[in-house]
Amino acid sequence: MPRRRSAAPPPRRAAPARSASTAAALPPRTMAPPPAPSRVQQAPPPTAVQGGSSPGFFGNLVSTAAGVGIGSAIGHTVGSVITGGFSGSGSNNAPADTSVPQSSYSNSVPEAAYGSAPPSTFASSAISEEAKNACKGDAKMFADCINEHEFSQCSYYLEQLKACQAMWSNQQ
């Protein structure tokens, strides 16, 4: 058996050189575009969600409802704290006194002397207006804090508002 050589392959023959006129006459060679892939890859189908990793539709629904309920309860509580001192509503169930205040002046004074309302009505309305306006700044600062921060961060403003409302309720 003859031995085979494992040396380098024989050199290739060089192509004959073309003259400038022949090179200009031939059109340039174009390469064929690469063949398109025969199989288009598709995304794998979504896998089924294992139990416990996602709460699902009803879990999300219950969670949202709980959040709305808690938010509503906190909002109503804050609203009643802010407006409770001004509207006269509170936890007591005593009926409101709707009687007209009695004037200490005699009825012999003509009504034109003091206007359309007796003097005692002017005094009581001035006090209630003053009470409403006295705590307005505290209520606004508390409301601004609630809008920008957590409820727990606004406890200082809540205490100031409660103190103001208590002070004015004792003076009336």
Swiss-Prot record:
**Signal peptide start and end residues:** none
Biased-composition ranges for Low complexity?
14-29
Coiled coil segments of this chain: none
Say which domain of life the source belongs to.
Eukaryota
Q: By its UniProt entry, which InterPro entries does this protein fall under?
A: CHCHD2/10-like, Cys_alpha_HP_mot_SF
Compositionally biased region (Polar residues): 89-109
Q: Name one GO cellular component term.
A: mitochondrion
Which GO biological process annotations does it have? mitochondrion organization
SUPFAM superfamilies noted in UniProt: Cysteine alpha-hairpin motif
Chain spans, region Disordered: 1-54, 82-111
Where do Pro residues bias regions lie?
30-47
Please identify the protein, giving its name as recorded: Uncharacterized protein C6C3.02c
Organism ancestry: Eukaryota, Fungi, Dikarya, Ascomycota, Taphrinomycotina
